[in-house]
């Protein structure tokens, strides 16, 4: 029973594949592609700009930079004290 049902489906799929793309699905010509490139690049640039700005704002609003700065200051102070006690 499955073989009887799958053969017509296979034939229809094979016919669709061999038919090729429909006219609406055909590739656009080169001139329209070249004309659309600047618009797409501008859209891409603005999208990247917004994502970058959002990321920078999140970093500035977080306390990560302050914690990192404090950690480095503490570590530097400990190393400095260790050098002073070792070499004095």
From Swiss-Prot:
Organism: Cynopterus brachyotis (Lesser short-nosed fruit bat)
Leader sequence segment: 1-26
Entry annotated with the keyword Secreted: yes
Gene Ontology biological process terms in this record: lipid transport; lipoprotein metabolic process; negative regulation of cholesterol transport; negative regulation of lipid catabolic process; negative regulation of very-low-density lipoprotein particle clearance; triglyceride metabolic process; very-low-density lipoprotein particle clearance
GO molecular function terms attached to this record: fatty acid binding; phospholipase inhibitor activity
Recorded family membership: Belongs to the apolipoprotein C1 family.
GO cellular component, one term: very-low-density lipoprotein particle
Function description: Inhibitor of lipoprotein binding to the low density lipoprotein (LDL) receptor, LDL receptor-related protein, and very low density lipoprotein (VLDL) receptor. Associates with high density lipoproteins (HDL) and the triacylglycerol-rich lipoproteins in the plasma and makes up about 10% of the protein of the VLDL and 2% of that of HDL. Appears to interfere directly with fatty acid uptake and is also the major plasma inhibitor of cholesteryl ester transfer protein (CETP). Binds free fatty acids and reduces their intracellular esterification.
Subcellular location: Secreted
Any Pfam family matching the protein: ApoC-I
Protein name in UniProt: Apolipoprotein C-I
Record's keyword terms, sorted: Lipid transport, Secreted, Signal, Transport, VLDL
Major subcellular site: secreted
Top-level lineage group: Eukaryota
């Amino acid at each position: 029973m499955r073989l009887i049902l799958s053969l017509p489906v296979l034939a229809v799929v094979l016919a669709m594949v061999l038919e090729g793309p429909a006219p609406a699905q055909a590739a656009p010509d080169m001139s329209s592609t070249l004309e659309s490139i600047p618009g797409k690049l501008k859209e891409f640039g603005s999208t990247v700009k917004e994502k970058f700005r959002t990321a920078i704002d999140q970093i500035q609003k977080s306390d990560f930079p302050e914690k990192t700065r404090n950690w480095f200051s503490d570590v530097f102070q400990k190393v400095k004290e260790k050098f002073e006690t070792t070499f004095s």
